Amino acid sequence: MDTLLPAFIDAEEQEQAQEIRTFLKEQGADLKEESITPLQDELAEILECCQVCFKEDAELESVMNSILSLVLVVPEKRNELIKKCCDKLKANMSEDENSSAAARLRVLSVLFSGLPEKDPMRHEVYCTQLTIAAKASLVDDIPTELELVKGWLGLWDVDADQRRQVFRLLHGALHDEKRSEEASKVMIELLSTYTDENASAAREDAKSCVVSCLTKPNVLIMDNILSLKPVAVLQGDPIYQLLQIFVSGDVQDYKKFYDSNTDFINSIGLSHEMNLKKMRVLTLMSIGKETDEISYEDLATKLGISSDEIEQFLIEAIQTGLVKARLDQVHRKVIISSVAQRTFGINQWQNLHSRLVKWRDNLLSVRGGLQSVVPPITV
């Protein structure tokens, strides 16, 4: 299907290009009056000075949409011209020109839609959208859903470096807008693109990712981060030791680490009190894997709190959705019904497989029993 974009005038391609050239020259562009051929060379020359129409949003959109409608039909140098369009739209973005950012994004949105969904040049266009939106605080004006973006990257068949470029720009845009939850997910996706061979290049990104997850009160399970190649490169660093404690340690492990690394904890902006709250919930989750009940006194000792604080702590732990438990106030015990897995490795997969097989066998047994007492239905 042919791509249709808004046009400056309704005319043949070369005539449209001549009209755009004339208009830009009238706006002060350093252009000759005579058009040149072939069309791709004409468009390249026009794009060199198209910024003269960026003063007014209406002119910017009209002229750039018309140029792009021609770019998409040229037989040669199409990708080169699209890149030049993107470069022009993201250039000259001084603070006092941010009012035109919305218009630039609208032009890019039209271009993005005008390209086939599997066209690799959509990558260039989307990166330009992210750059402009981040600079002008207009991130809400463009699509940023991680699953959608990952789907696009699969369609465009881009390489690892191009994927990283998108994830890095997307993370920066979301981070600047204080959308930290989404930004963290994007950073994890970015780190997952690295291999053993190049993981060391993402060392600082890995540190940033770990700190970001540790600072979030609602993020408690982090074994997925520990398995990322760039995070593994951090082994031996205090940040890696701290992450290991949050993945599989307990309150006492954290307290020992804090006593030896207080300055480090403070330097990366972590709250000691928040860390303790998270570690207490994580410790209870580990306890719940070993036993289904524990006395107030024993639990208080393991968590480093008083027995009087157990009730309030349990309420907060249950609110995380990772623990199901109740108080037995008569016998001063905590009864633990279930807890989430802190880590999910090969042992957990094998256990899940065994449980599913047992469930399947039970269902087959029930079906066999029913078939033995209920006559088959004939039609």
From Swiss-Prot:
Entry annotated with the keyword Secreted: no
PROSITE patterns: PCI
Major localization class: cytoplasm
Keyword Phosphoprotein: no
Signal peptide as annotated in the record: none
Pfam families assigned to the protein according to its UniProt record, in alphabetical order: eIF3m_C_helix (PF18005), PCI (PF01399)
Molecular functions (GO terms): translation initiation factor activity
Record GO biological process: cytoplasmic translational initiation; formation of cytoplasmic translation initiation complex
Similarity annotation: Belongs to the eIF-3 subunit M family.
Biological role stated in the UniProt entry: Component of the eukaryotic translation initiation factor 3 (eIF-3) complex, which is involved in protein synthesis of a specialized repertoire of mRNAs and, together with other initiation factors, stimulates binding of mRNA and methionyl-tRNAi to the 40S ribosome. The eIF-3 complex specifically targets and initiates translation of a subset of mRNAs involved in cell proliferation.
Protein name: Eukaryotic translation initiation factor 3 subunit M
Organism: Nematostella vectensis
